[in-house]
Amino acid sequence: MLNPSPRVREYENIPGVVRLDIPAVASLPTGETADTTRIVERFGEDILAAGLHNGAQTVYVKPERLLEFAEFARTDEKLRYEALTDVTAIDRSELPIGNGERFQTVYQLRSYSRKQHLTVICPLPNDDEPAVPSLANIYKGAEWPEREAYDLMGVRFTGHPDLRRIMMPEGWPNHPLQKNVPVGGEEVPFSMTWSDPEFASLGTQILPATSVPPTLPPGMNRENMIINMGPHHPSTHGVLRLVVELDGETVVKIDPDLGYLHSGFEKTGENKRYKDFVYYSDRMDYLSAMLNNFGYVLTIEKLLGVDIPPRAQVIRIIMTELQRIASHLFWLGTHVMDVSGTGMSVMMYVTRERERILDLFEMVCGARLTVSYIRLGGVYRDLPDAFLTNLADFLVAMPVRIDEYERMLTESPLWDVRLQGIGVLSRDEVINMGLTGPMLRGSGVDWDLRRDMPYGGFENYDFKVPVATEGDCFARYTVRMEEMRQSLRIISQAVKNLPDGPFKTEDRKVALPPRAELDVSMEALIHHFKLMTEGLLVPPGMLYHAIESSKGELGYFVYADGSAKPYRLH
């Protein structure tokens, strides 16, 4: 019998995490911990803690065994955690408990073949210069998330092939997500007062011409042509800089510079109350605001253990599937513009259909893009009478429109030649890169979180998951087109089975009481006052919860310390 490591006891006070003695893991009654049992048997005292936490399999691993652990988790026949979906880090310096290490790295592993998820936490021993081995040579998809954790949290990943900042500019003076960096802690380099002396010569000065040697990203060949595309370029559909290496007309390499639109959502979220971050989640991707709301509130509701009324569940599914269609329509229009298959015509057509969806959104909440409609405990308001009538008309018209788009594009020789055989990714490549959503399904991986790890009531719906095997741009196009049809199928079932009842929970500690109740109930007034002043108190614990968004897996990792604000929000 193995004995637990003495160091395990340093982690006994982590919020919500119960330390499990190694022999006890095997005796857990549910088969969901069979994976943690096998891991503990393999690594013994190097597993600091293991078991279920908020329903999720969680293990704590010593950093010196992390590489070996990751390779074992990926290749072992009984585990087969072939994908890494997320990497982040936690700065625990402001937690009021325990004497453990300041920094921890957090990994989310996924087994598509076994429909299992595993959260891996690695405490880092050096508080001043935290470092941990990079997993990029095991999971290709770790490269960018590790760069982000280094950039924003200051954790160095030894052995990383290209460890540099990814969001903040090089030379930024701090790592913003560390707890000792305040919100707005950076110095603003410009004055806002035109009378200040620094503006006296504005527009009149001539700077001396100086020769600046070009700085190339790692791996670029100076013998080829290097072109800067963006950050302001119509083909990037946003503020994005691409350093493109060309050999003649062939693109050899692209190095993306992503940070121009970095808005600090995580730092902001850690300084906002749980209920207030719903409005920020819209802005993470305004083309998928409903889905952003949905993923966030599901995570918090699972931490709270709150039950959602059946009517609210069905309304959420209707709205998020409408949002999926709207997002796919916008993708289709911009994709056609870039490929120039039929010029601007398809963009105008899909905009017409997308406007009908936005009209439906406006009917329920008054907003079209940043809707903030899905709230903690339910939805903002019930469906108005005219909503279902207009939705029924849309459900009749939309399948015909999708067929029209396919005829316009699929029968176009130009469309075919510019998509078929282009951007081919094999099944193994998309899994190891950590790609999700239509990218994953376009390369032959039959996986959809709505079906394979159902949430929010999706287990009650009958729909197909479209999969293609070619792995090229055309395959991903066909997957998204069929996904719109399947979303219509889900919405039709939801409308048919829409129950009566409340549209939000009656737990007054989670959702505000209705206005009429405030006039007659002092208790309702007290609940309203406490929710608006103190906020919603989430019990200590942590959770990673993911949904199938329009662009792929959208996961939220929340570390709660018992207050009204998330200690860590990722």
Residue ranges and their predicted role:
Residues 63, 193-570:
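Metal/cofactor-centered catalytic core regions of large enzymes
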